[in-house]
Amino acid sequence: MIPPPPNTSSLTCTPEEESENYKAVENMFATLYFFLPFSAFAALLANVIYLIVVTVGIRKGKLPLKRYALTINRTCADIFTILVGTYFYMKQKMDRCDSHICLPVETDMSRYVLQVVFVLNYWCVSLSYSGIAVLTNYAVRAPLQYKVNLTSMKVAKYILMGWIALLFCFLLCILLVHQGELDYNSNSVIHLFLDDFDSDEFIGEWLVDLCNHIKSHPGSRSLIVTILPPIVFYCISVVSYVFIIHLLFSRRKVSSYHRHWGSMLRLGIHLILFAGTCALTGTAYLGSFSIGDICENYKTNEPMCLDPVVLYMWNTAAALIGWICRMVIDATVDTFNDDVLRRTFFNSIRHRLLTGPTNTANDTKLILNQIEISCNKTSTGPSRKTESVQMESLMKIKPSRSRRLKINAQKSATIIEENIA
């Protein structure tokens, strides 16, 4: 018995409906390419400002390195991801060399680099959040051991070991899950950076390329590699967060524990943002499954309903913009909601702006007093004698007892003045 043909009634549309679907996809690309540069610039600016503020505070000794090492790790990963994505975005916009900038022609290596950076950024951010949650739990439960036993060098070693473990797991996923191939294009984010849809490429050609990638590299494999490790780290963060909240609530009457609520608020915001962006990314991956039926029937000449494609691309664009907005909000929250950072940096800037002339006069007076004190300390002989002559004369002439007492009194007064100054 011959099996009945597949039901394609839900996949076929009128030519007018197909044309509307194509226009919807084109409008999505135009909207995304309009907002993408602004959101990427905002993310880069916010993370660079946070990195500069923290670096200056650490170099001046006002901020502890071990407390901000993991956020610096996340910030550097976000900045590197933005720069790599910006390079490929500019390349696909300018590779026609019709103006003043001409970047290299796209190769498979560029596609691989972009995919590796995007996937590792997901992993690095989730690992940083889990590390922050675990260290905060340690600081709340055993504050004395946290201050004594945990050093900046140990935190740096933990971060280095984390990166080594991430790279090892990434290579292991490529060998086991992807059969030695590196291709995550079924999530379509790579296409948004490598293809110029609004100028020299048709949506139909892109859809054929996307179908080929979905057939050869199903979205389930990319979903496992991209989302599964961050989910594991996220569970660790949430468990640590719940334990910390329970401990702080049980000790809410102890004033020394109140200072941890600010850091818990920041960590809660980070975890909520990360969960939302992971949900958007997972939705974009799952949307590739519904395109499989369209790809099977796309070889026919019948007009196809591209509603799943339109929904899939909007989910992909939302996942990309959401991830970039996560970079902006994370850096902004860490910059302006950190009490220690705000006290040590922004309050000092405000104080200098409000009392600039007074501080300048006080600094000048202090410098003049120090110069006068140093002159008094060195002027023990005639002004025209050299230092060797003065020392020689002091060695030859033995001062009287009253003279020695007077000299000691002057030295004591000088030391007191220096300490007061």
From Swiss-Prot:
Gene3D superfamilies: Rhodopsin 7-helix transmembrane proteins. This is Uncharacterized protein ZC21.6. It comes from Caenorhabditis elegans.
